Structure formats: C-alpha cells, structure tokens
Amino acid sequence: METATIFSIFFSCLLIGLTGYSLYTSFGNASSELRDPFEEHED
C-alpha cells in the first residue's frame, strides 16, 4: 500500500472514533454527570 492510502485510512478512522466518542459523551450514559454552567449561575 502507498503511504498516502495508509495515512488517509488512519485519519478517517481517527476522525470517526473521535466523533463517536464525543456523541457518546454528549448523549450517552455519561451525559448525566456533565454540569451545565448556565444552570448553576442563574440570575
């Protein structure tokens, strides 16, 4: 395989993994532990 092909596959997998992790953190089970700074400082 060429170096560019390996790099593009690696970069694509990395991007998909980070997107999946961020979606899981935002909407998954861990989202109940996130704090909302706007809700804490209501005036």
From Swiss-Prot:
What job does the chain carry out? May play a role in photosystem I and II biogenesis.
Q: Which GO terms describe its biological process?
A: photosynthesis
* UniProt name for this protein: Protein PsbN
UniProtKB keywords? Chloroplast, Membrane, Plastid, Thylakoid, Transmembrane, Transmembrane helix
Keyword set includes Repressor: no
The listed locations are: Plastid, Chloroplast thylakoid membrane
For this UniProt entry, which segments traverse the membrane? 5-27
The organism's superkingdom is given as: Eukaryota
Is the Plastid keyword given for this protein? Answer: yes
Tell me what organism the protein belongs to. Mesostigma viride (Green alga)
GO cellular component terms attached to this protein's record? chloroplast thylakoid membrane
Where is this protein chiefly located? plastid
Topology of this chain in the membrane: Single-pass membrane protein
Gene behind this protein = psbN
Which Pfam families is this protein grouped with? PsbN
| Family per record | Belongs to the PsbN family.
What is the taxonomic lineage of the source species? Eukaryota, Viridiplantae, Streptophyta, Mesostigmatophyceae, Mesostigmatales
